[in-house]
């Protein structure tokens, strides 16, 4: 019986040890996989913040890529350390949890606040949701909220999350603020390509009035048509009406000699009849 209990305790101890190793935070091991965060990894080691972060069980690091962190990397070491501590949130947040925040503005506690040096809430951050985007800024009243959430780089619920933001957050009293980078220039839209198969309309013929209104020398000169010569002109074709007139003329010709003889004989008969009547 005692052997079974001791075996169970041994297994439980090993399980707890393994789970603690698996869940242990190692910010250096995470960031070294991403070359774009190499400068931040170096600054965390230089300011001796790496072992402090690794001792935490639940943490969110607001990471800055090499270009973004360049605006503070040349400042005094103590100032850089205080600024970086304000980029370590003592809670777990990834994209899902950030977007699920119901409040428009949420106050987050940072590693700088845990040092007891915070004044006027400069050890807190504001997480603000606006127009579908998420912004971070100092918790000091009136401080700008200009560090935009970009993406979740690494997540190990609910121990470590690395969230990339667009620019450093410098709280009042921790150093001079960082200027907001200008937005990228807007590219002009490309010109629409001409539609295929669209026929170009032919120019409309000009009216005579257009030529009349045109200044001298611009109106087109048209050569007058030369009258055809008599030799070149073809003979007129016979008209059908002329044929009818010729036929009518043929019908109206004087009577022939036979018809004249008939008339003379009739006249003699008439005269004979008249003479006989007078004789009686």
Swiss-Prot record:
Extent of Low complexity compositional bias: 219-234
Q: How does it sit in the membrane?
A: Lipid-anchor; GPI-anchor
Q: Which residues form the FAS1 domain?
A: 25-169
Query: Which residues, if any, are the signal sequence?
Result: 1-24
Q: Pfam families given for it?
A: Fasciclin (PF02469)
Compartments, record wording: Cell membrane
Glycan-linked positions: 26, 126, 159
Q: Which family does it belong to?
A: Belongs to the fasciclin-like AGP family.
What this protein is called in its record is Fasciclin-like arabinogalactan protein 3
**What species is this protein from?**
Arabidopsis thaliana
């Amino acid at each position: 019986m005692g052997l079974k209990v001791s075996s169970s305790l041994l297994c439980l101890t090993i399980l707890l040890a393994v789970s603690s190793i698996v869940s242990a935070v190692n910010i250096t091991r995470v960031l070294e996989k991403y070359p774009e965060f190499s400068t931040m990894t170096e600054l965390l080691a230089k300011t001796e913040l790496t072992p402090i972060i690794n001792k935490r069980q639940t943490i969110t690091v607001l990471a800055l890529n090499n270009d973004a962190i360049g605006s503070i990397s040349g400042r005094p070491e103590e100032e850089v350390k205080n600024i970086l501590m304000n980029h370590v949130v003592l809670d777990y947040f990834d994209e899902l949890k950030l977007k699920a925040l119901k409040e428009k503005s949420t106050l987050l506690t940072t590693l700088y606040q845990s040092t007891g040096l915070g004044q006027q809430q400069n050890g807190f951050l504001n997480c603000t949701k606006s127009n579908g985007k998420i912004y971070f800024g100092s918790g000091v009243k009136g401080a700008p909220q200009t560090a935009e959430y970009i993406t979740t780089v690494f997540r190990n619920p609910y121990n470590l999350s690395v969230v990339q933001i667009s620019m450093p957050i410098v709280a009042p009293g921790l150093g001079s603020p960082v200027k907001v980078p200008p937005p990228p220039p807007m590219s002009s839209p490309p010109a629409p390509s001409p539609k295929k198969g669209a026929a170009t309309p032919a120019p409309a013929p000009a009216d005579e009035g257009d030529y009349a209104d045109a200044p001298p020398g611009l109106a087109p000169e048209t050569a007058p048509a030369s009258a055809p010569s008599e030799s070149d002109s073809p003979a007129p074709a016979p008209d059908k009406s002329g044929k009818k007139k010729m036929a009518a003329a043929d019908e109206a010709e004087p009577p022939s000699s036979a018809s004249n003889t008939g008339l003379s004989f009739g006249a003699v008969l008439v005269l004979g009849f008249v003479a006989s009547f007078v004789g009686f």
